[in-house]
Amino acid sequence: MIDDNSRKKSLTGTVKKVRKRDGRIEDFDKKKITNAIFKALYAVEGENDETANTISDIVIEKLDRLYAGQTLSIETIQDVVVETLRETGYERVSSEYKSYRERKAELRALRGELGILDAPKLTVNAIEVLEKRYLLRNERGEMIETPTEMFWRVAVAVASAETMYGGDVDAKAKEFFKIMSRLEFLPNSPTLFNAGTDTNFGLSACYVLPIEDSLEGIFTSLKNMALIEQSGGGVGFDFSELRHAGDVVKTTMGVASGPVSFMKIFDAATEVIKAGGRRRGAMMAVLRVDHHDILEFITAKAQPGVLTNFNISVAVTDAFMEAVKNNQDYNLINPRTKLVARTLSARYVWERLIYNAWRSGDPGVIFIDEVNRHNPTPSVGVINSTNPCGEQPLLPYESCNLGSINLSKMLQEDNTIDWDKLRRTIHTAVRFLDNVIDINPYPLKETEAITRANRKIGLGVMGFSDLLIFMGVPYDSEKAVEIGESIAKFVTEEAGKASEQLGLERGSFPNFEKSIWKGKYVARRNATTTTIAPTGTISIIAGCSSGIEPLFAVAFMRHVLDGTRLFELHPIFERMAKEKGFYSSEVLKKIVRRGNLRDIKGVPDDVRGVFVTAHEIAPAWHVKMQAAFQKFTENAVSKTVNLPEDASLGDVEEVFMLAYKLHCKGVTVYRYGSKGEQVLNLGEPQGEDKVTTADAEYAGGRPTKGCEVCG
């Protein structure tokens, strides 16, 4: 497309200075232009660095000719880049680069209008996600708020609960706004969607509904599920009370169709509901391992396209695990009669479970006895299910609202953890989440009653992988596990102190006297305080790694929501590569083909270790990290153990056994490529065309379309 020989003039380099948008003057650096052009070309056309260098030379030549000796603005330089791309035949690249600039300019203008010029930068992808799913629109579909206005809307709504306790609404609104607008803390998506609006939709992410063994009971739960999903919440169910397929139904003299058949009805209903909503529906189906239909349940998602709105998990008991270890039979129970229906080899069922998890990622496992050992209100009820991603065990009808602290914002200048800032953020976040309970318009009266009685909240973290990178600690190391454990311990201890203080101010949760906390706290506002959620979408808004997951890629192409592709490079890696002198377009091309730094020449070993990605990490390290956080987390931890495509059945069994041994409350595996539809696809190290790609809303963890509710 470019004729180098037609360019006769030499580059004089008379442009020496550039004026930044904040007014600062810096030295002109051609490399920045070349890098920007390379990323734009590579994202759209897959062109090489030679083309980028050639176009960059033409840009410099034009700047010298038109603006010799002048100090140029960023906008002027970018205008010339757009013009040059078009003139050299790269019309599509020029158009997409121009659109990218316009989106960035739009956001800067909004910040200026609202007086928050010091606010952290939202990424282009964060803006796309916010605009498509979060920001309010009028009846004509026109956007009527900015990201900053969204944060202020939510802050004011949540702070309004202070009037119930004589608090300072304005002061708390500003405090809540500060931690959200600085991306230090974000609540779960339903709170961002609905707080401060007139929709009367709920603010909680997590719900569990009971299913009674009758047609009326089943369809009552179906109706309740629809009401919850309409507001953006996700629902967990325990199907274990439903009689097994083939069992007698006395009222009709017929036979029961079993839990799996009814799961299909719930799945179909969710499909209809999500068609008119902003988010995919999300559900968790749990079945006890001693249910008569356990084998049918284990294979329920073996075929692609079945039960796509469900995560499914087997509730595994200690007794079953002992039977597996001892190669014994165990009893299956008839839910209707509570009597033994038949016996099965525990080993056989275990192997079926492992095989299907290896084959498709489903089912996961919930260690239900471990969950109930930590039930804060055992006299109130038994926990049988969790929210869709498994991190929030709940009683029947109970709900919980979640929020996560961005750990990448909790560092001092020397990249050590700023414990004082983390403490302050925890206390503000606990108050925020407790307030949500009071202003929440509950979809069901039963949910309101049990939620207000226990006042569970789930404060967690995101950006953990970014924090480790800043600290120079590889994810798959004992040091990283120690850091994870210390953070979890600190967050839970401080959240407990914050809840105790709120209990003294406002009163303990009504079931406090029946809880495990009586005698351990003088007062306590919340039955639980901490949860590690996957934070899929809110971590994109915050511009950090998701939950406690490792990086999924160092460089990749992101398919953004308008159909274009953006070249994304981890910003810390980019800065480090430039500082250490190994940054080049050739290195970037190699990284984007495979997503990681393995075997890429020129990258120092210490850098390669710090930027280790999920599929490079041995499965045991995934489990150890989950266990480290679970040790001090009051609810549960959502994390995916990512396995390479060539992982064996034995690898899956080792993961499940280690998770049980280390007292995880559940475990989920995903073997790369085991589902046809993935939102993350790795490139080929030796291929020229195939690169690592990710969908707009993928931030890490399980690389398939999943729950959009918890974060």
Residue ranges and their predicted role:
Residues 1-17, 24, 47-157, 162, ...:
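Core nucleic-acid recognition elements
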Residues 29-48, 152-160, 546:
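Short, surface-exposed, low-complexity cationic segments
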Residues 90, 96-110, 315-316, 320, ...:
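Terminal amphipathic helices with adjacent charged low-complexity linkers/tails
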Residues 155-164, 177-251, 255, 259-262, ...:
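Function-dense linear segments that define catalytic or interfacial modules
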Residues 222, 425-448, 452, 456, ...:
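Internal maturation/activation junctions in enzymes
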